[in-house]
Design a protein with these regions (language model features):
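Active-site hotspot residues in diverse enzymes, especially metal/ion-binding acidic/histidine motifs
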Residues: 1-289
Length: 289
C-alpha cells in the first residue's frame, strides 16, 4: 500500500464522518472506528497503543504526559491501524523517528495527517502565499498539529513547486513534494547526507534549536538538476532529537523544462555531445531575487 492508496483510504473514511468541528473534537473519528479513548501515563517514548476486545470494540490508550497535539496525532495514528487493519510495529524506534520504522507505521502516520488536516478544510483555510515561519505556525495552531506536520501538509498540497524534507542525525529520511515538483521528476534521495551549503546544514552545525530562512541553489537539493537556479529554504533544527526539517520552494517560472516518463523519472537528453564550434555558449539563465 503506497502513499496514494493510504490517502485515498483516509479520504474515504473522512467522507463518512461529520468533520465540521474536527479541529476541536476528534470523537466523530473515534466513533466511526468503533473505538473509545483513555489517557494513561506511559513510558518515555511510548505515545499509545490499541487493544481490541472480543466484541470488536477498540480501546485506544494515549500517553497523558505528552502534549495535546501529540495525543491528537496518536489517536488518529491508532485509528489508522484499525481502519487499514495494519499490525503495530513500534519496536524500540521512537514514534517521531523515520529511521528503521516499519512501513505500517509510516502508512499510519500518513493516514493520521489526512485526518488531522482534511485536505478540503486545509485548502479553504491556507493563505495563497509563499510559506513562512508565521504562516506554518498559524496553520499548525489552527489544526492542532505540530509545526513539522503543518509544514509537510503545506508542501504536499501547494500549487507552487514546493517540498518538505525530514532529516535525522544528518541524513535525509523523508521528502514530500508538491504536484508541480513531481510532474518534473524532482527527486531528493533518501538516506543522502544533508547538503553542505543548505540552511539545514548550517543550523544543524550550530548544535542548538534554531530556525532560519535563506536562498540556496536548487541543485543542492534535487538530483540531476539544472544549475544556476535558486530556491528559498525555511529550516528548523530540533537539537534534542537531532532532527532537522526544511521547506523548499520557488516560483513556477523557475522550473527547468524537462520531460518525464510514466514512472515520474526525468528523461535525459541522450543525443550525445553537441558538435564543437569554437564558440562559448551564453551562460544558462539564473534567477535571483
Amino acid at each position: 500500500m503506497d502513499d496514494a492508496d493510504v490517502r485515498q483510504e483516509a479520504r474515504g473514511f473522512i467522507a463518512k464522518v461529520d468533520i465540521s468541528n474536527i479541529r476541536e473534537d476528534l470523537s466523530p473519528y473515534v466513533a466511526a472506528a468503533n473505538a473509545t479513548v483513555k489517557q494513561e501515563e506511559l513510558g518515555e517514548g511510548e505515545s499509545g497503543y490499541t487493544i481490541t476486545r472480543p466484541n470488536g470494540k477498540h480501546i485506544i490508550t494515549v500517553n497523558s504526559l505528552e502534549t495535546e497535539e501529540r495525543q491528537r496525532f496518536t489517536i488518529c495514528h491508532e485509528i489508522a491501524h484499525i481502519v487499514l487493519d495494519l499490525e503495530s510495529s513500534h519496536e524500540e524506534v521512537p514514534s517521531w523517528s523515520y529511521a528503521k520504522r516499519h512501513q505500517n507505521e509510516i502508512a499510519c502516520d500518513t493516514f493520521a495527517a489526512e485526518l488531522l488536516m482534511p485536505y478540503k478544510q486545509w485548502l479553504s483555510r491556507v493563505p495563497k502565499e509563499e510559506p513562512s515561519l508565521e504562516l506554518i505556525q498559524e496553520m499548525a495552531q489552527l489544526f492542532g498539529t505540530s509545526f513539522p506536520a503543518a509544514a509537510s501538509r503545506f508542501a504536499s498540497l501547494s500549487d507552487m513547486p514546493c517540498a518538505f524534507v525530514t532529516m535525522e542525525r544528518g541524513a535525509v529520511r523523508y521528502a514530500a513534494r508538491s504536484t508541480a515538483l513531481r510532474n518534473v521528476g524532482a527527486w531528493i534521495s533518501p538516506r543522502s547526507t544533508i547538503p553542505v551549503g543548505s540552511v539545514a546544514h548550517l543550523i544543524r552545525s550550530s548544535g542548538n534549536n534554531r530556525t532560519d530562512t535563506a536562498e540556496v541553489p536548487q541543485d543542492l537539493w534535487f538530483d540531476n538538476w539544472d544549475r544556476g537556479l535558486v530556491l528559498w529554504e525555511l529550516s528548523r533544527h530540533y537539537a534534542r532529537t537531532d532532527t532537522t526539517i526544511s521547506v523548499l520552494w520557488f516560483d513556477s517560472d523557475e522550473l527547468p523544462e524537462v520531460e518525464v516518463n510514466r514512472f515520474g523519472k526525468r528523461i535525459e537528453d541522450d543525443c550525445g555531445l553537441a558538435e564543437l564550434t569554437g564558440e562559448l555558449p551564453w551562460p544558462g539563465r539564473s534567477k535571483r531575487r
